[in-house]
Amino acid sequence: MSKSTSKILVIDDDPDFVAAVTPILKSALYEVVAASNPKEAKEKIFAEKPDLILLDIMMDSLFDGFSLCHAIKTSKEFKDYKDTPVIFVSAVKEIAGTRFQFKGDEEGMAGPDDYIDKPVKPDDLLARIARLLKQ
């Protein structure tokens, strides 16, 4: 898949993060679509058919990102998008002293394809996206 035709959906309730990451993605010729909450994200997934999703873990509640990722990867509602790569982004590296680690579907929760800490490093973000879009 050519990155010049790839569409990335950025799902984050922080408008500053969306404003910061959008020019990074556009500089690499990605088309960028944004959503600020899970409800809007679902609408954008169906309307825009993204090639990759950048998903904030914590939005209105702690589990919004986890729940949405699990739905995308496993529910019948999103069956056409279950193979869409999802990268979690978050400023929170730990909850109760436990570092986030994602190795696939553990304990019934389908995880993301990758994880990146905020603030993102542009080169690192673009390299991860390119790797996932080539799979």
Spans of model-derived segments:
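Active-site residues of response regulator receiver
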Residues: 56-57
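Acidic, metal-coordinating helix/loop segments flanking the phosphotransfer/catalytic sites
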Residues: 34-52
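Non-catalytic signal-transmission and effector/linker regions of two-component phosphorelay proteins
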Residues: 1-7, 80, 117, 121-135
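Acidic di-acidic motifs
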Residues: 12-13, 118
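Acidic catalytic/metal-coordinating carboxylates
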Residues: 36-40, 63-70
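Two-component/phosphorelay signaling modules centered on CheY-like receiver
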Residues: 15-33
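Alpha4 helix (beta4-alpha4-beta5 surface) of REC/receiver domains from two-component response regulators
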Residues: 63-67, 77, 82, 92-116, ...
